[in-house]
């Protein structure tokens, strides 16, 4: 990257997640909400990817032969199960500590993931391209959302997909995803999310459309305390996911 160029990296966020790196794979630790969230996002990714690429979602390895980027992969909570679906996965994160934890866990689990301590900009500048880009629970932690989305979009191959998951910038989200989750329920460490860094759907859709991608699906996600599970929902006021495709 040239000197003075814009960057998507918020070093404070990188440092904060690096400090918690040892907790990534603890289902009762600081990343417990992501462990709970994983089944619904994995199901969404599998089903939409199979629909796009003409695969059977019930097969053992439905993503066989597809190249997938998990940007901001953290400790690999998403990278590993996607690799188990047959995909060739690149897990990228700017934190060396996160990548170290992810690599160690994958090796111990017998899962092949290409983990790299790199930024989205570095991958794009190297000309890397993917059938699927996973941009999950990352945009609310970057320094420049528009640049980050544009950079990720560049790496989506013709006919390929980008999945985005984040938290909406609404008062409802401030009350539930920040105040309640961090201060009352203690699901997350205080300071995990800042209201001003939350992202509205249109702020993601605009740079994706400007990059030549078409928004093909939107869904909310909510936590059902009775079933203790996350479910897809029409309500996008708090957690939501977007799907966009680059025309073939």
From Swiss-Prot:
Signal peptide: none annotated. It comes from the Bacteria. Keywords: Methyltransferase, S-adenosyl-L-methionine, Transferase, Ubiquinone biosynthesis. It catalyses: a 3-demethylubiquinol + S-adenosyl-L-methionine = a ubiquinol + S-adenosyl-L-homocysteine + H(+); a 3-(all-trans-polyprenyl)benzene-1,2-diol + S-adenosyl-L-methionine = a 2-methoxy-6-(all-trans-polyprenyl)phenol + S-adenosyl-L-homocysteine + H(+). GO terms for biological process: methylation. Pathway: Cofactor biosynthesis; ubiquinone biosynthesis. One of its GO terms (molecular function) is polyprenyldihydroxybenzoate methyltransferase activity. It is an enzyme of class 2 (transferase). Gene3D superfamilies: Vaccinia Virus protein VP39 (3.40.50.150). Its EC number is 2.1.1.222, 2.1.1.64. S-adenosyl-L-methionine binds at residues 41, 72, 93, 136. SUPFAM superfamilies: S-adenosyl-L-methionine-dependent methyltransferases. It holds the Pfam family Methyltransf_23. Transmembrane segments: none annotated. CDD domains: AdoMet_MTases. O-methyltransferase that catalyzes the 2 O-methylation steps in the ubiquinone biosynthetic pathway. Belongs to the methyltransferase superfamily. UbiG/COQ3 family. This is Ubiquinone biosynthesis O-methyltransferase. It comes from Rhizobium etli (strain ATCC 51251 / DSM 11541 / JCM 21823 / NBRC 15573 / CFN 42). The lineage of its organism: Bacteria, Pseudomonadati, Pseudomonadota, Alphaproteobacteria, Hyphomicrobiales.
